[in-house]
């Protein structure tokens, strides 16, 4: 269900206590787990973007924990959730791993709710050994998730043209490796009440050596979360520009700024917002 359970409360209270008592930067707290721990990282971590800057699930043993805690399969219940912006989420799973069942629902929910996701897969089964998995999908460590800070805004990339086709639920025998959002990067520039700027770009083949073909350009929808000072309300009219392109976005009921069909390349361009 969606109500907080005693075990989750103990985990969060313990993390808070350690952070407070051991001089830990509260903006650089991360959560990761393998197998059952990966399921827990998703189920506990996604709800607590106020605690965790980013989370990483290695071959999670099921997505049901996250599904229930985030009400991914029950839109009605999800409307009543009042959660902070989620942590940036990394996940890698093997389509030939029985525990990976349901990742199509997980990916669709993350995409539909404009939650940040870097997702990698391949025919590596339930392995949690990086050396072994890298032989199947060499992208799993390509994003520096431990450099994410909780006190910095981030872009959410959805519906990208460069995403691989998911093998879930109907093509699990396909051994092809794949990725979602693996090549997108950003750099924060400014974040004030009236002005927000963020540089968006794709990593290039010169910067990342991989067996995957990195496209020269891609089209993607971009939403903004964890803005530190600028707030949006339903019905707000927000002017934006991205390189030579500009437009106006009306904020919807989710109170999230989204601009669709931006063209990204390895050349950084600045997304600017003015209120």
What is each of the regions a protein language model found here?
Residues 22, 48, 52, 59, ...:
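A generic secondary-structure signal for well-formed alpha-helical elements
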Residues 1-36, 46, 51:
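Gly/Ser-rich "nucleophile elbow"/oxyanion-hole loop immediately N-terminal to the catalytic nucleophile
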Residues 113-118, 124-274:
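Alpha/beta-hydrolase-fold serine-hydrolase catalytic core, especially in secreted/extracellular enzymes
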Residues 61-151:
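The feature captures the conserved acid-bearing segment of alpha/beta-hydrolase catalytic domains
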Residues 51, 85-87, 218, 236:
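Residues that flank catalytic or metal-binding motifs in active/ligand-binding sites
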Residues 2-13, 99-115, 235-246:
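Extracellular low-complexity, Gly/Ser/Thr-rich intrinsically disordered linkers
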Residues 18-25, 75-84, 229-231:
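Surface-exposed acidic, glycine-flexible loop patches that form ligand/cofactor-binding
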Residues 31-34, 39-85:
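Hydrolase active-site cap/lid region
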């Amino acid at each position: 269900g969606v109500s907080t359970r005693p075990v989750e409360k103990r985990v969060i209270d313990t993390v808070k206590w350690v952070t407070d008592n051991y001089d830990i930067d509260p903006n650089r707290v991360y959560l990761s787990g393998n197998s059952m721990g990966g399921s827990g990282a998703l189920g506990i971590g996604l709800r607590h973007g106020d605690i965790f800057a980013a989370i990483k699930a290695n071959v999670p043993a099921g997505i049901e924990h996250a599904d229930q805690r985030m009400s991914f399969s029950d839109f009605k219940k999800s409307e009543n959730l009042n959660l902070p912006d989620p942590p940036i989420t990394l996940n890698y799973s093997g389509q030939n791993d029985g525990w990976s069942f349901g990742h199509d629902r997980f990916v669709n929910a993350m995409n539909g709710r404009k939650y940040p996701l870097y997702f990698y897969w391949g025919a590596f089964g339930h392995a949690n050994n990086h050396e072994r998995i890298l032989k199947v999908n060499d992208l799993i460590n390509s994003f520096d998730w431990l450099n994410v800070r909780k006190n910095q805004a981030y872009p959410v990339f959805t519906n990208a043209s460069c995403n691989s086709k998911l093998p879930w639920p109907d093509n699990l025998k396909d051994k092809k490796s794949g990725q979602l959002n693996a090549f997108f990067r950003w750099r924060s520039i400014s974040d004030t009440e009236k002005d927000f700027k963020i540089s968006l770009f794709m990593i290039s083949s010169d910067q990342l050596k991989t067996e995957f073909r990195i496209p020269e350009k891609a089209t993607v929808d971009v939403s903004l979360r964890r803005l530190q000072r600028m707030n949006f309300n339903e019905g707000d009219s927000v002017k934006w520009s991205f390189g030579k392109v500009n437009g106006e976005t009306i904020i919807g009921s989710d109170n999230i700024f989204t601009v669709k069909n931006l063209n990204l390349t390895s050349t950084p361009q600045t997304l600017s917002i003015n209120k």
